[in-house]
Amino acid sequence: MISLKSIVDKLYNLEDLSYQESYQLFDYFIKGQIELPLQTSILTALKLKKETSIEIAAAVEALFDNTKEFPKIKGDLAGIVGTGGDGFNTINISTTAAIVAATAGYKVAKHGGRSVSSKSGSFDLLESFGVNIELAPDQTKQCLELYNLGFLFVPFYSDGFRHIKEARTILKTRTIFNILGPLINPARPNKVVIGVYSKDLILPMAKTLVNLGIDRAVVVYGSGLDEVAIHDDTYVAEIQNNQIIEYKVSPVDFGIDTYAIKDLEGGLPEQNREIIKQILLGKGKEAHNAAVAVNVAMLMKLYDKDDLKQNTQEVLEIIKSGKCFNILQQVINYSNK
């Protein structure tokens, strides 16, 4: 076993960790074997050094090895998630996009937790809707099979995350756990859209996904947002056959107007719930509908639907039909049986 001291010394010298060292470090983290002051120092050192794709992949495996197993789903399974930490406090776009994608017929396992840095995390929102977020894995699997949608509350699958909650709250800044968050979906989807909070993270995240053996994925950075943007360009790294292709898209590529970031500003869970409810009922504002639609359109690309304009129009029609709220309501009812 590698000693914690030797790992910490390397980090203090801003040296990269080996796969084994990073695995051991995050095994210590998740088992609560690192004191709070040292946790904050380690997370700060990693951030200053900049995390490598090897360190991230090793950390993911360490976290998975300390997580409850989720039953395997037959066929394709999608995930759509952001790192958080972009600082804009937008409405919960990835959560809404997951519900809309499920309505469109794609199986989506949405994982996450309560808010650390924003006003309302994805599961703060879901709880405000009345979703029972602590559903047993076999029940969540059945929910996925019935309604194409399942919510996986990460702390329910690994109570070790409580050991790092205080350090993250104290630091009030983005840490490697923002990067790890999107990668630790217990359902292990094979098609994922991941939004990152920094352009510098696009390639490390994409390389990590290749290292983890993900089938198809896109990593996106939306000019300040950790999702596909409707206010400016979105930088993309797409993964297919272990290859990474980088490109850029703009609102015009999706056939939509350009909007301002402030058009997407969210609030407390109760305020967000009302905004999201209106979107799902087909009564949302144009900017809100567009933001959700472009993110689902990007997910559809992973299913060989390459025409982003056509994808976006299809999704907008589904949103405006009001059917999306029915799916959420069925999941709420199922989760509270």
UniProtKB/Swiss-Prot annotation:
It holds the Pfam family Glycos_trans_3N. Binds 2 magnesium ions per monomer. Mg(2+) 2 binds at D226, E227. One of its GO terms (cellular component) is cytosol. Its cofactor is Mg(2+). Its EC number is 2.4.2.18. 5-phospho-alpha-D-ribose 1-diphosphate binds at residues 82, 85-86, 90, 92-95, 110-118, 122. Anthranilate 2 binds at R168. It catalyses: N-(5-phospho-beta-D-ribosyl)anthranilate + diphosphate = 5-phospho-alpha-D-ribose 1-diphosphate + anthranilate. Mg(2+) 1 binds at S94, E227. The keyword Secreted does not apply. GO terms for molecular function: anthranilate phosphoribosyltransferase activity; magnesium ion binding. Anthranilate 1 binds at G82. GO terms for biological process: L-tryptophan biosynthetic process. Pathway: Amino-acid biosynthesis; L-tryptophan biosynthesis; L-tryptophan from chorismate: step 2/5. Keywords: Amino-acid biosynthesis, Aromatic amino acid biosynthesis, Glycosyltransferase, Magnesium, Metal-binding, Transferase, Tryptophan biosynthesis. HAMAP family: TrpD. NCBIfam families: trpD (TIGR01245). Belongs to the anthranilate phosphoribosyltransferase family. Homodimer. Catalyzes the transfer of the phosphoribosyl group of 5-phosphorylribose-1-pyrophosphate (PRPP) to anthranilate to yield N-(5'-phosphoribosyl)-anthranilate (PRA). This is Anthranilate phosphoribosyltransferase. It comes from Francisella tularensis subsp. tularensis (strain WY96-3418). The gene is trpD.
